[in-house]
Each structure stands twice: as structure tokens, then as C-alpha cells.
């Protein structure tokens, strides 16, 4: 479901304008770096404000893509990076659809945000992504319930590049202190769990160039 995004690279994030806030963020970055699980802080656009070394290690092998790198905007990465499924297991239902739900909610709250609008335009330019957003997302939410759209507490599959881990479940935990929340930020951590799955190869569907393959989540029209 990922595709090559055609939008422009997001503009640099504004730096908080008080010394106190900047000092807090610098100290919080030290705290974040001390965590062993991949962690990141994002704003309402999913622009990555900061991320720790474990997060960078998880996605270090991603080939360069101008508008959809995990350390720039995590929403764009999940939706648009052609290799996101190499790390994010069960990519469509585990990651893409929940993130589409978050985009939809963000647009309802921040409808005039230029970056969110740009992401929505990039979705509209791709027939598969547009079908997922308009048809697949409501169908999926109806099938699994609103709770499945929440990230906090969700268990997701990672295909960890460390061969000692391989396919590994993680629990996404949102833990945002008040000072970050006041800035419009949220912190998410991927708590790696002990490997409870057989280390079988995890296959993901590949999309042929120029072929509008049918998304599994989009209901098939009846004849």
C-alpha cells in the first residue's frame, strides 16, 4: 500500500521561542536517549520532533526517500515509503489503516494545516491509497471497531533488522508529560516483547509498477 510520495518535503519545524522550553526539550532528549526501546516525540502532523538511538537503529537500513523518512514524518513514512513494510510487519492492517484513521482525525481538528492537506493530496493522487482512505478505512473500522484505531496499548509486529530478534511484537505505549502536551507533542514508545512467534519468513504483498492491485481491506464489488 506504500507508494512513492510526490509531495514536497515538509518545511522545518519551528523552534520553541523560549529558553526555558528549549532547555526542557534538550533535557527530555537526554531522557529519551536513555530508553532502550525505540521512542519518538511527534507533533499533530506526525513530524518527528526527536527520536532516540533505538529508533534510529530500527530504521537505519531504510533507503533514502526524499519525503517519507521515518525520522522526518512518521505518518508519511508509514503510508508512502516503499520499503516501510520491511520493518513494519502486517503493514496494511497493523500500521497503514490505523495511521489513516489518525490522519482523518487530525484533519477534522486541524483542517487548515498545510502539511496535513499535502498528505491528503498525495493520498488522492494514488488510486490504491485513495481507495483505502475512502472505502477500506470505514470498512475496516466497522469490522474491527474504533478501538483498533488507537495506538496506545496496541500490539504491532516489527521485523527487526537485528537477526537475534527478527519478527518481534511490540506494544505501542503513549506516555506524554504535561509539558510536552502543552507544546502539542506526544511521545510514543515501541516496547519490544519477548519473541512469542515462530521465526517464519514474513511475506508482504508487493505492488507491481503500474498495476492497481486490489487492497485486501477494500470490499470487493459483488457481481
Can you describe what each PLM-predicted range is?
Residues 19-42, 48-219:
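Hydrophobic protein-protein interaction segments
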Residues 1-22:
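Short amphipathic recognition helices of helix-turn-helix/homeodomain-type DNA-binding modules
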Amino acid at each position: 500500500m506504500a507508494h512513492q510520495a510526490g509531495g514536497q518535503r515538509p518545511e522545518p519545524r519551528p523552534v520553541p521561542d523560549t529558553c526555558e522550553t528549549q532547555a526542557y526539550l534538550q533535557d527530555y532528549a537526554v531522557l529519551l536517549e536513555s530508553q532502550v526501546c525505540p521512542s519518538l516525540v511527534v507533533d499533530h502532523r506526525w513530524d518527528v520532533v526527536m527520536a532516540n538511538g533505538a529508533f534510529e537503529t530500527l530504521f537505519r537500513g531504510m533507503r533514502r526517500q526524499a519525503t517519507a523518512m521515518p525520522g522526518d514524518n512518521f505518518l508519511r513514512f508509514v503510508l508512502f515509503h516503499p520499503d516501510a513494510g520491511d520493518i513494519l510487519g502486517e503493514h496494511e492492517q497493523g500500521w497503514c489503516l490505523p495511521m489513516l484513521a489518525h490522519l482523518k482525525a487530525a484533519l477534522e481538528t486541524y483542517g487548515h494545516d498545510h502539511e496535513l492537506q499535502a498528505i491528503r493530496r498525495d493520498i488522492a493522487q494514488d488510486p490504491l491509497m485513495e481507495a483505502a482512505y475512502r472505502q477500506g478505512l470505514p470498512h475496516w473500522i466497522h469490522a474491527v471497531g474504533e478501538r483498533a484505531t488507537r495506538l496506545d496499548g496496541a500490539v504491532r509486529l516489527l521485523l527487526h533488522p537485528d537477526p537475534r530478534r527478527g519478527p518481534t511484537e511490540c506494544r505501542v505505549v503513549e506516555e506524554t508529560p504535561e509539558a510536552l502536551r502543552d507544546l502539542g507533542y506526544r511521545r510514543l514508545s515501541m516496547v519490544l516483547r519477548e519473541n512469542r512467534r515462530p521465526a517464519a519468513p514474513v511475506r508482504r504483498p508487493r505492488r507491481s509498477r503500474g498495476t492497481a492491485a486490489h487492497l485486501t481491506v477494500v470490499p470487493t464489488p459483488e457481481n
